[in-house]
Amino acid sequence: DWHRIGVSGRASYEKHGTSSCMKLLSCISGLNIRLAHEKKGCASVLIPWLYCGENVYHTFFFAPPGVGKTTYLRDCIRLLSKGNHLRAGKKVGVVDERSEIAACYRGIPQNDLGPRTDVLDNCPKEHGIHMLLRSMSPQIIAVDELGLPEDFAAVADCARCGVSILGTI
């Protein structure tokens, strides 16, 4: 799993042309430890509500940090990819920019995302969405932590192509 620690403190920046990037974090004042884990089946109750006939609705999870948006997203991906006795599994493409959905190790997902799921790990959402649309013929594209204008522009491109989106915001 992809465990992580958030750190707060005094930030120092270095200027690079017209932009700057953080160089150092000193005077550490806080830590937030998050233990990632799968909760298989947690999204089972949601799956019937995601369908419109055989198609999947565009679905976005909104909630405060730390309440399980990514956990529900991951389980929805697994359940939609797997299918069940009523519906065939769907081809799902995942853009996992921060390796929090699939937790890939050397390109292999360590979390169970289902048998029909393709993962682009460590790939910016905007680029990954377009790569999946062009090359993997997904029925659904899943992304975590949408927020930038270019992320939403790529999501709009998915909708225009007839591909369903699952995401967190």
PLM regions with names:
Residues D1-N55:
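P-loop NTP-binding catalytic core
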Residues W2, A11-Y13, V56, R98-I101, ...:
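Conserved nucleotide-binding/hydrolysis micro-motifs of P-loop NTPases
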Residues K40-V45, V119-H127, L146:
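A general structural motif
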Residues A43-E97:
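P-loop NTPase nucleotide-binding module
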Residues C52-E54, P65, K82-R87, P109-D112, ...:
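Conserved catalytic network of the ASCE P-loop NTPase/AAA+ motor domain
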Residues Y72-D75, K125-M131, A154:
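Well-ordered alpha-helical segments embedded in enzymatic catalytic cores
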Residues S81-H130:
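P-loop NTPase switch/communication element
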Residues M136-I169:
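Conserved P-loop NTPase nucleotide-binding/switch module
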